[in-house]
Amino acid sequence: MQGRSVSVVRIFSVFLFAVLVGFLPLGAWAETSITLKNTFIEKYKNRATITASFTVDKAHKKPNPASKDGDLHIAGRAPEVGLPIVAEIMNAASVPQAVARIHEAEGTDREISLAGAWRIWTEHGGDSEQIQGKKLAPFTTSNPDHVFEIHPVTKLDDLSVAETLKPIAGYKAKDAGPAFHRYEITKSQIIPGKTTTTLVTNMAGFNYVEFLLELSEAPHKVEDGYLAKAAVHDVDDGELVVRNRRMVFVEGSAPAQAVKDMKEGGCLHVLGIPRIDLALVSWRARNAKARPDALRWSLPYEIIVVGLYKDNACERI
């Protein structure tokens, strides 16, 4: 009975917040406008990763402490992206060789081959306009206004760091309920164009989230990983939070290895980070005439699964 009361309070709180937010126009919140080339959207909409010729402008001197997420932040530029980029190595203290390579390249204008999950998310976009292909000057900070990340990084030149895609010991990730409710109610507007598509949205935040993933289908193999629709459950009580959200698994990572042979109904206890779902952006833009209402639906997002917890938490579902 107590658990049911908690669930009712949680649902009511989220509903009330959604109603209050719904009365506010998109412009009432700090907006970020993201203009992407349609060719880029189509190329990467069903891919897990990107490989970029990356110029390291500015990096953290050392990784964040585990309590703050354990990442190493690296600001830079790449012709394949054409936007301000922050690359992030997860659990960076565990790969000192990779950290050293970043610092060796920092400020030299020497490009390195950097691969990892592409991520577009409005956590650090500011009240800004991000236009793909706009000329960029070198950055003097490791955290410029940006919406594009290569996060997590999986490879630097010939050095693999795929083993860093794992839970962050000593870090408290966001709980599934509040994190996914934030993602679900974030507003957006898509403006289709002949060669570009613009997405206008607000800061979403809620970076790392821990949850139980229940597959709605068997995973689909793509060039650089796996994609699968899944339901999201709370870790503590197994409560259903979100139905049918796309999950992204990076080739060579522990989560990808765990999910690849699973079937519908399979469950994993995971750590994830959200990103804008370019497949949904593409669909909404293509169907603008038939479904104009879709251009103002809530933010299209998916989850990159970046860590696997090995326990029996799935028994709570």
Language model regions located:
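Residue-level detector of intrinsically disordered, flexible termini
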Residues: S5, F17, G27-W29, K58
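Bacterial N-terminal signal peptides
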Residues: S13-P25
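Bacterial N-terminal signal peptides that target proteins for export
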Residues: Q2-L16
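OB-fold and OB-like single-stranded nucleic-acid-recognition modules
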Residues: A30-I317
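Intrinsically disordered, low-complexity, compositionally biased regions/tails
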Residues: S7-V8, L26, I276
